[in-house]
Amino acid sequence: MNATATQDRPIYWGTGRRKASIARVRLVPGSGKVVVNNRSGEDYFNRIPGYLAVLKSPLETLGLESEYDILVNAHGGGLTGQADAVKLGVARALCELDPDNRQPLKIEGYLTRDPRCKERKKYGLHKARKAPQFSKR
């Protein structure tokens, strides 16, 4: 088990990535609060409830949303990418907590890393696929 104990409270780690975002997640037994980069989850995600619902969804699948605090160090990308990275990190930490959690999380798709990233810009084009205007004559 990859859990670290602090004052008899085990800490479960998980790392999540999405687009350009990386989130290191710690699950600590607690009351269900979310702390992202030393700020409350509501404050960090600009009080947009959709982001908090996304990152708590693996806990809600297992019925553990009020039993663990989520402590996150996230960087890179934007809020959407970071929220999805935290979701993957929480799911991986829940697998560390109990290997039996893996099956329901896998069925819901929480353990699958989303491989879609920004496509690079090609020379001769304005963006990745946007070509200059074509003139027939």
UniProtKB/Swiss-Prot annotation:
Pfam families: Ribosomal_S9 (PF00380). One of its GO terms (cellular component) is cytosolic small ribosomal subunit. Keywords: Ribonucleoprotein, Ribosomal protein. PROSITE patterns: RIBOSOMAL_S9. InterPro entries: Ribosomal_Su5_D2-typ_SF (IPR020568), Ribosomal_uS9 (IPR000754), Ribosomal_uS9_bac/plastid (IPR023035), Ribosomal_uS9_CS (IPR020574), Ribsml_uS5_D2-typ_fold_subgr (IPR014721). One of its GO terms (biological process) is translation. One of its GO terms (molecular function) is structural constituent of ribosome. NCBIfam families: PRK00132.1 (NF001099). Belongs to the universal ribosomal protein uS9 family. This is Small ribosomal subunit protein uS9. It comes from Picosynechococcus sp. (strain ATCC 27264 / PCC 7002 / PR-6). The gene is rpsI.
